[in-house]
């Protein structure tokens, strides 16, 4: 990640856990490509640029400075660079955040974008916001949990159809936020219309489209809808012939999208690959919302098995159509039971699971539900550790980033922030806290202890540690192991 002040996220975290090394990730790659101008020299930009003389450039993504999925400054630089390279008509389709940043901050982000687009209009570029909606309700679903979310985005962005119509985005956000149970995350879809009531920016044949998020997981589904001619997840009504590129390639195995502006990090020689080819049979399991993390991201942004005879991946369907605070226990016990079964079967030397509760429910702002979620995760951990005790195994318990351990917004002194009514403001984003790690179990060799000479160990140190626990030396270029054996 760019700096120590950037919040970790699940994708970067699982990349580090699985790869054993730190790779420049989405935000850093995009920053570099924009700063050097390399982005504009690549095949992806050249591809979309062919639409500039006669058609519209559409930009779809999260309007935020959270740095988890996207960044506003990168969007502004991309708009600037495209306008300087021939884009005469630009439409931005915004998705409001309120999850990785403060709820309500979308108004300020929209004002910043509107002001910049107004400056471009003064220079003769027809640049406007065309549509919008909240990230959890419009476009940004993941792992095929709810295609209805993507359809709402498609209807607004491509067809120019939405239940709410406004003359500008700031007015839209302010008005819609006043509706009951509405927040930045769950803002209903809207389109911007002209003085005649016509939408200003539907996507049509010949247009160029860029999804500008750098994080992959919540762009894959809209990328499929934009790129695949053979598509049956919802009725697209029409499928415009466009030039589409992602900010990055979101799925290396699917080659999706086929065109992209920034080359992805090349993550090779992951711990999963090493262990599989050295005879370590592996079982990985989570529910839908984190299944990709214990497989695709763990394996270096690679879909599928290294060796299907040596691996088994199990996905438990997540609840769909509800927010996770409604069912905060999620599928923790089901995941644990699958893990327990895999352990007791003695078919596998490594069993890897992700319990999503504290992250997914922590994002909802409900402290009461998050307490229930954490208790469910605790129960699940006990089920797994009891099985490990039975077979004489070893456990490693850690996390990919912080979230539920602090759900209060704080000032620089650590004091809680209050709203205008004197109530504590709830934090829905990840945190900058270090994550814990616990290693134990009856299979742990006598004398194994944490090293004292790795005071700043992080997620990338876990891979070498796990390889050591399996009886292997880690590759020399991996981040060092966290453990050592001390003779008693």
From Swiss-Prot:
Mn(2+) 2 binds at residues 10, 400-401. Its main location: cytoplasm. It catalyses: (2R)-2-phosphoglycerate = (2R)-3-phosphoglycerate. Substrate binds at residues 69, 99-100, 135, 142, 215-218, 290. The active site is at 10 (phosphoserine intermediate). Keywords: Cytoplasm, Glycolysis, Isomerase, Manganese, Metal-binding. Binds 2 manganese ions per subunit. Its EC number is 5.4.2.12. GO terms for biological process: glucose catabolic process; glycolytic process. Monomer. Catalyzes the interconversion of 2-phosphoglycerate and 3-phosphoglycerate. This is 2,3-bisphosphoglycerate-independent phosphoglycerate mutase. It comes from Prunus dulcis.
């Amino acid at each position: 990640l760019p700096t120590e002040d950037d919040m970790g996220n699940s994708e970067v975290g699982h990349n580090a856990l699985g790869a054993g090394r730190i790779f420049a990730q989405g935000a850093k790659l995009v920053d570099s490509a924009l700063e050097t101008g390399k982005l504009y020299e690549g095949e992806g930009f050249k591809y979309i640029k062919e639409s500039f003389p006669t058609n519209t450039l559409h930009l779809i993504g999260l309007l935020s400075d959270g740095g988890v999925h996207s960044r506003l400054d990168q969007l502004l630089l991309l708009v600037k660079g495209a306008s300087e390279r021939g884009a005469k008509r630009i439409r931005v389709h915004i998705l409001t955040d309120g999850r990785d940043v403060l709820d309500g901050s979308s108004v300020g982000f929209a004002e910043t974008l509107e002001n910049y687009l107004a400056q471009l209009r003064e220079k003769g570029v027809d640049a406007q916001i065309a549509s919008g909606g909240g990230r959890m309700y419009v476009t940004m679903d993941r792992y095929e949990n709810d295609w209805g979310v993507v359809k709402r985005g498609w209807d607004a962005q491509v067809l120019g159809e939405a239940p709410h119509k406004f003359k500008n985005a700031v007015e839209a956000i302010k008005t819609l936020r006043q509706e009951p149970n509405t927040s930045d995350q769950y803002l209903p879809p809207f389109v911007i219309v002209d003085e005649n009531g016509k939408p200003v920016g539907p996507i049509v044949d010949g247009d160029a489209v860029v999804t500008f998020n750098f994080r992959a997981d919540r762009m894959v589904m809209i990328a499929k809808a934009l790129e695949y001619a053979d598509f049956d997840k919802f009725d697209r009504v029409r499928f415009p012939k466009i030039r589409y590129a992602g900010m990055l390639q979101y799925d290396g195995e699917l080659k999706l999208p086929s065109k992209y502006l920034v080359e992805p990090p090349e993550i090779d020689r992951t711990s999963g690959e090493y262990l599989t080819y050295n005879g370590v049979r592996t079982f990985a399991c989570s529910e839908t919302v984190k299944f990709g993390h214990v497989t695709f991201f763990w394996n270096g942004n690679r879909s599928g098995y290294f060796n299907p005879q040596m691996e088994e991946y199990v996905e438990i369907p997540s609840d769909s159509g509800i927010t996770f605070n409604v069912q905060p226990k999620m599928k923790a016990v089901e995941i644990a039971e699958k893990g327990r079964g895999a352990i007791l079967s003695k078919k596998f030397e490594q069993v890897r699971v992700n319990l999503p509760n504290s992250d997914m429910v922590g994002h909802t702002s409900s402290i009461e539900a998050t307490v229930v979620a954490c208790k469910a995760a605790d129960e699940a951990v006990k089920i797994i550790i009891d099985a490990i005790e039975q077979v004489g195994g070893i456990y490693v318990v850690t996390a990919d980033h912080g979230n539920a351990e602090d759900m209060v917004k704080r000032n620089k002194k650590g004091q809680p922030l209050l709203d205008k009514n004197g109530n504590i403001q709830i934090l829905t984003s990840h945190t900058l806290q270090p994550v814990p790690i616990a290693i134990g179990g009856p299979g742990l060799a006598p004398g194994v202890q944490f090293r004292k000479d790795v005071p700043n160990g992080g997620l990338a140190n876990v891979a070498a540690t796990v390889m050591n626990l399996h009886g292997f030396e880690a590759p020399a270029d991996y981040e060092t192991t966290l453990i050592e054996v001390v003779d008693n």
